[in-house]
């Protein structure tokens, strides 16, 4: 006889209604509530799932490696990392028509592909991989490892290999293992890989299994390591540096120094391996965590930390809450470090990938943090023992929870009214034609902190640190240069717009925290319902008969906090994205001017950057490489809006809807073959909220993901069929004005100064010239099929023949760039004039050199042969 779902609850399995399905899904992972579950079997099952989880991670990583090696273009990309678009995998989709196949097929490609925005190419390259064979080997290794871990998970569920409860409760041994083995040894292994493989690869030396054992990374061997003389490894006189303490970013790559990264991981390894031997285990030596906690009593803390050892050690929810909070903070830091201190070669030049990774990690951090508070609330309901925690810090926190909640409430109200008040005031001033009367507040405290960390800002003193204050030699040699370099990502220039959005984000963070803290601290009881813990609050939330009980459980706080968390992460990512596309596009002035009022955010960030999504596909315009994101943008809105149907409509509506749907289904021929035996009942309020929250969340993130990737890829094309959106006449006028365009006989002439496009005396287009040239591409596309001449010019220094050749090569390089962006080759002509057509004197009247004049003469001119010149 088949066992009805759910097997873990006989009560639910015998329920004759559809509640059986919904409650079964809702409690599938609530192992504590399952039939026959003991504390020991609970720990054993969770332990086994860890192996399964790791196996899935290894399998996922293996699949990434395998598909890039099989269907990607890794070796081609390695040969030109800034010029070749990385490919994630091929697309085999029977729904694709001719237009889609062409749009997603790169030039010279065999078929449609997906561009990679994951950053994996940059990771693999930085790790020292250079060939597809390296990727295949890594994939096979991880596949084997996944298999081993699956077997290990199964093995630890067998009676002979199940660890005992005492083994799980041995906190000191577990901590030693985590510190030494997991953190320490894994950091040591990574440092070893960096030193033996990645650093030599960056220097052009290949180290693989064939020469790994006989290729020394440093002539001094291990003697300096074990004698503590690590400085030898940084000394260029002693050999190629492998461990350094330079600081900042390598100016040649814009990323962290690999030798600094190796040093960091080796130091972490040593510290953690030592730390993992501090606690008392089998040998009776070392620290006892319980003794430390019991002895730790600070002022005004009552019994201090007495009782916390057993409270934490006996509560999986407490442990999970701590782990989720820690991981949430780390994940948000990863997002910040990805752009401020990037580690992977060439990734800072891939703007779409940088935007995707930042946003991805901030959203994950948000969910982890909300989860931390959710499990904190469950701890208070299920695991908290008031007698074991009398007058300790945990009990005292519960006793003064009203002070915590009221202070958070005050901070949230203050931030909300003042921040919104400033924004609205500025909107009113602009709407009434008085922009000069905006309230613009400089973030002087933040700028002061930047200066104390080494940044030089005129007018702000370095009182506690920085050049001239910190003792010579205390700053890392590379740090000051990196912090103060042009377009340094470490400390961005900030102004009134940053000040306002910073406080808007602070509002979101404090309000989210208020809801979560109140939900957790009130989980056992509140003024309204002091004995709340005695009522269970299972999923139905149809109440134990008291009014309002559906809105005061910890679950409801979690539910409401998710909306605020999403708002907050939305503001964070909006801010990051707009700030960075203005920096990449050398258009910081627009951000500074428009970010101080709400209409500026709506118009100049959201609406202006929606163009590639709104015009993503049409009967007349056809399909392009961003069409799928335009479709996803629409679909995300649909999912998000569906959420409101669940969130606003209540029980009576659901009862009618579900019964109507079931009645209709039961009268179809197919449904009569397999009769639906469960009696339909409406969802509970909580279930309706859960479904609504899921739709709202997924739609919200999907909509912004599509917007983020398509808008960034359109500005900085990094797709197999680069798409630059058509621009309006007004936008074309702005670009023409930016490049000092002027009407000339036969058309309009744009001026590209040398310093925007080329390095001095070079003919290859600079990496950071993309944004400027992309705007020119938009203007060329605006003019449809009009022919374009690209004219190169130099100054008079050097031989005539050399200058002629340089001017021709520069014109050809710009022509090649335009072709790569989709401008038809037959429209483009490249010509070089050398020094023959100066626009300013190369020498002053007295015969001396005229550097300003020579700089004006080193230029590329774009002549669009048209009669329509939208220049004011």
Swiss-Prot record:
GO molecular function terms attached to this record: 4 iron, 4 sulfur cluster binding; chlorophyll binding; metal ion binding; oxidoreductase activity
Chain positions recorded as phylloquinone binding sites: 654
Pfam families: OmpA, PsaA_PsaB
Binding-site residues for chlorophyll a B3, renumbered to this chain: 645, 653
Main location: membrane
Residues at which [4Fe-4S] cluster binds: 541, 550
Transmembrane segments: 46-69, 135-158, 175-199, 261-279, 316-339, 355-381, 403-425, 499-517, 557-578, 626-648, 690-710
EC number: 1.97.1.12
Residues annotated as domain OmpA-like: 745-868
UniProt-annotated binding residues for chlorophyll a B1: 637
One GO cellular component, as annotated: plasma membrane
Keyword Ribonucleoprotein: no
Disordered: annotated span: 829-861
Cofactor binding note from Swiss-Prot or TrEMBL: PSI electron transfer chain: 5 chlorophyll a, 1 chlorophyll a', 2 phylloquinones and 3 4Fe-4S clusters. PSI core antenna: 90 chlorophyll a, 22 carotenoids, 3 phospholipids and 1 galactolipid. P700 is a chlorophyll a/chlorophyll a' dimer, A0 is one or more chlorophyll a, A1 is one or both phylloquinones and FX is a shared 4Fe-4S iron-sulfur center.
Localization: Cell inner membrane
NCBIfam families found in the cross-reference section: psaB
Additional notes on this entry: The C-terminal extension has been suggested to be able to bind to the peptidoglycan layer.
Function statement: PsaA and PsaB bind P700, the primary electron donor of photosystem I (PSI), as well as the electron acceptors A0, A1 and FX. PSI is a plastocyanin/cytochrome c6-ferredoxin oxidoreductase, converting photonic excitation into a charge separation, which transfers an electron from the donor P700 chlorophyll pair to the spectroscopically characterized acceptors A0, A1, FX, FA and FB in turn. Oxidized P700 is reduced on the lumenal side of the thylakoid membrane by plastocyanin or cytochrome c6.
PANTHER family for this protein: OUTER MEMBRANE PROTEIN, OMPA-RELATED (PTHR30128), PHOTOSYSTEM I P700 CHLOROPHYLL A APOPROTEIN A1-RELATED (PTHR30128:SF19)
Name of the protein: Photosystem I P700 chlorophyll a apoprotein A2
Source organism (scientific name): Gloeobacter violaceus (strain ATCC 29082 / PCC 7421)
